[in-house]
Amino acid sequence: LRALVASNLAAQSAEQLSLAAVPIVAVLALGAGPGEIGALATAQTLPFLLLALPFGLWADRSSRRWLMVGCELLRGLSLLVMLVAALAGQLSLELLALLGFIGAVGTVGYSVAAPALLPALVPPAALAQANGRLELARSAAFAAGPALAGALVAWAGASAAFVLATLLSASAVALLWRLHEPARTPAAPRHPLVELRDGALLVWQHALLRPILLTAVAWNIAWFVLQAAYVPYAMRALGLDAGAVGLTLAGYGAGMVAGALLAPRLVAAMSFGRAVVFGPLVSVAAMAAMVATLRWPQGVLAGASFFLFGFGPIVWTITSTTLRQTVTPGAMLGRVSAMFLTANMGARPLGAALGGLVGAHWGEAACLWLALAGFVLQAVVIAASPVRVLPHLPATPA
């Protein structure tokens, strides 16, 4: 487990460094505008929608550890090519988009295989704690990565950020090499579409998995409605400059770290079902705080809102992932993980488009109220489900 946690920290740090460094380099070195930055972001997002399900099948048919090794090597190779191109002065927007796509392919495979591998490394009773350690690593990388990338590019140029990201990716591979994966009995090969159908039916027909999926989709739509409106709202209505907007957004990363640190105590202090519902309820409180800025336009209130948005959902991620891993048969963990990833990523552009449409026609305030409605909906879905009354984790399926 220690090797997986350390590898995850290195891989997440490499990802966050590169995600932050690429648009900075594109603007400073290549004169990219909003359209080009949007195209780069699209290139880094498409693999999640196109390849998560194939990677889920792969993770259920072969070694999950070696899938992670291969995918992290692919991401490391894309970072190395970025580094060489930066040193040679040969970077272009087209090359950044291509390498961003390739690197994201590696990220997808790693992201699908890691939660599928974890239940084989720890007993069911230790799953929540293990997921907490993985999420703490992700939270730390998310909180520190963008600031570190910006500082490196500003002080030492683009190559410095790519050097560090490449070294971190190589470290992630080395740590995975040391990890021992218990042998699994290979399943009889079947048509891929049949296996995907079985995974989808399991999620949709399961009394615990379906509300978790619907809650996550509703949360992502509401979150990206808010994201579409927040920066212009903060600058126009709250009177914040760029630096102050950045400080309010930094509350999100701080909340993630705090939530990951406190999650074990929170889970131990209440029934497991209530611990799962805790995160969605905190999201409602967070959005209510943001809506309150319509009456009291204070940046501190917006920062507190983002802190809560980091704090509650990280507890949700830990508890809901643990529940998902516990009730899913081991042979289907890869497909189920991929389906959740695909649904969540698919909800994001829908939320962003909805937020943009509402904001353009009715203003940022309407977006805030719409986002609040979405967060209330996701809390109602999970609170009205059988998940809420779980006293503890259910038994692991055979």
Give the predicted meaning of each segment.
Residues L1-A398:
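Alpha-helical transmembrane-bundle signature of multi-pass membrane transport and export proteins
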